[in-house]
């Protein structure tokens, strides 16, 4: 749809919620909203091959991973699912700073340690933390109020 991505407008031509939020934050002297990077859902699976076959039927194709190590990344359009056998206890929302939805590096991104500092300043409790004395790859996990883990995993 024309103007949807670039201008972030709804079908009615009005700015969407994200644009309104950006404007509200700017008016109050706050930084831009957090750019968490590419979004996917990471699913714990009992049988990687059976899960892959199921999601193939929904139009997903394998774009990465290593079945021998128990994980695959599947894609359908802009939608990404990670299948993980024996790696996680629960399904997780996953964000990858520095990547776009095609797992390609973005020109600019907010480092995972900066995201962590911002969330700590807002009182968010962490399940795991990125080592703030390092650079490059790092990750942290927070848990939402309903117990859903959210992984922020930077690969570069």
Residue ranges and their predicted role:
Residues 79-82, 146-150:
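Short, charged/polar, Gly/Pro-enriched secondary-structure boundary elements
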Residues 2, 8, 46-49, 87-88, ...:
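Vicinal oxygen chelate
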Residues 71, 80, 92, 139-141:
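Short hydrophobic/aromatic beta-strand element in the GNAT-like acyltransferase core
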Residues 68, 86, 132, 153-155:
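Residue-level structural signal for beta-strand termini and adjacent loop
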Residues 61, 152-153:
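Short hydrophobic beta-strand motif reused across regulatory alpha/beta modules
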Residues 2-7, 13-53, 155-156:
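N-terminal beta-strand motif that seeds the catalytic metal site of vicinal oxygen chelate
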Residues 35, 42-87:
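Core segments of cupin and vicinal oxygen chelate
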Residues 38-40, 90-92, 149:
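Structural motif
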């Amino acid at each position: 749809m024309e103007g949807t991505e670039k201008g972030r407008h709804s079908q009615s031509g009005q700015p969407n919620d994200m644009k309104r939020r950006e404007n509200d934050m700017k008016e109050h002297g706050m930084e831009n909203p957090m750019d968490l990077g590419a979004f996917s859902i990471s699913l714990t699976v009992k049988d990687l091959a059976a899960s892959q076959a199921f999601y193939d039927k929904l139009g997903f194709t394998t774009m990465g991973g290593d079945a021998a190590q128990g994980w695959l990344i599947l894609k359908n359009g802009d939608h990404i699912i990670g299948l993980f056998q024996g790696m996680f206890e629960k399904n997780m929302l996953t964000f990858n700073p520095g990547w776009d939805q095609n797992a390609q590096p973005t020109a600019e991104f907010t480092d995972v340690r900066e995201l962590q500092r911002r969330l700590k300043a807002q009182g968010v409790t962490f399940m795991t933390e990125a080592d703030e004395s390092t650079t490059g790859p790092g990750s942290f996990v927070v848990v939402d109020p309903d117990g859903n883990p959210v992984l922020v995993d930077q690969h570069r």
